[in-house]
Amino acid sequence: MRILLSNDDGVHAPGIQTLAKALREFADVQVVAPDRNRSGASNSLTLESSLRTFTFENGDIAVQMGTPTDCVYLGVNALMRPRPDIVVSGINAGPNLGDDVIYSGTVAAAMEGRHLGFPALAVSLDGHKHYDTAAAVTCSILRALCKEPLRTGRILNINVPDLPLDQIKGIRVTRCGTRHPADQVIPQQDPRGNTLYWIGPPGGKCDAGPGTDFAAVDDGYVSITPLHVDLTAHSAQDVVSDWLNSVGVGTQW
């Protein structure tokens, strides 16, 4: 199995390095990751400037000023030959649950892999300690995919409790929960008296009941949520069409 491995925490982050070491026990792994932390970069792509890369002695590649999406795009289309069989993103330092997936560079890297036609996993740890647990879970899933490919055409967003492996209760297939809208901005002043702004923490849990990714991780289970690239709200198409007909928009200007 050939794996393109990326993340949003940066090429030196403990999550990606722990996972790369574990995956190399049974797979051909190419790391292509940002040269610095790009958390929250979502699906952004660098279009107004060129991208430079740096290759370390162990073969890992850092994309200077690159986003997670840049890294996967370059990895698939230029840097990994032959091309990968699968794209894996992570292990992220901290969870990507509920609407976190909208902002997550970890999920975005996997989404770019899927958009380019490859199976893709996004892996996050609900904490900053037991990366070995998340690595073991990921390796188990990838070995299973080698034996029996999962033909859903979906991204698997995997969130792992920050627990020792022997305390993980199992796996639950889940849906994304939701958070309350975030509204905190933290102002500060620089030495010249100019106001600086920091984006505050995410909103608290809103929909975190049974069946959600939040609930699974809180209960000690690995959460696997299938995600897809198509953002169309299919169930709303008829509602929007009926509304347009009702208000006359499009029939007269």
Swiss-Prot record:
Pfam families: SurE. Binds 1 divalent metal cation per subunit. Its main location: cytoplasm. GO terms for molecular function: 3'-nucleotidase activity; 5'-nucleotidase activity; exopolyphosphatase activity; metal ion binding; nucleotide binding. Its cofactor is a divalent metal cation. It is an enzyme of class 3 (hydrolase). One of its GO terms (cellular component) is cytoplasm. A divalent metal cation binds at residues 8-9, 39, 92. Keywords: Cytoplasm, Hydrolase, Metal-binding, Nucleotide-binding. InterPro entries: SurE (IPR030048), SurE-like_Pase/nucleotidase (IPR002828), SurE-like_sf (IPR036523). Gene3D superfamilies: Survival protein SurE-like phosphatase/nucleotidase. Its EC number is 3.1.3.5, 3.1.3.6, 3.6.1.11. Transmembrane segments: none annotated. The keyword Nucleotide-binding applies. Coiled coil: none annotated. It catalyses: a ribonucleoside 5'-phosphate + H2O = a ribonucleoside + phosphate; a ribonucleoside 3'-phosphate + H2O = a ribonucleoside + phosphate; [phosphate](n) + H2O = [phosphate](n-1) + phosphate + H(+). The keyword Cytoplasm applies. It is found in: Cytoplasm. Nucleotidase with a broad substrate specificity as it can dephosphorylate various ribo- and deoxyribonucleoside 5'-monophosphates and ribonucleoside 3'-monophosphates with highest affinity to 3'-AMP. Also hydrolyzes polyphosphate (exopolyphosphatase activity) with the preference for short-chain-length substrates (P20-25). Might be involved in the regulation of dNTP and NTP pools, and in the turnover of 3'-mononucleotides produced by numerous intracellular RNases (T1, T2, and F) during the degradation of various RNAs. Belongs to the SurE nucleotidase family. NCBIfam families: PRK00346.1-1 (NF001488), PRK00346.1-3 (NF001489), PRK00346.1-4 (NF001490), surE (TIGR00087). This is 5'/3'-nucleotidase SurE. It comes from Escherichia coli O127:H6 (strain E2348/69 / EPEC). The lineage of its organism: Bacteria, Pseudomonadati, Pseudomonadota, Gammaproteobacteria, Enterobacterales.
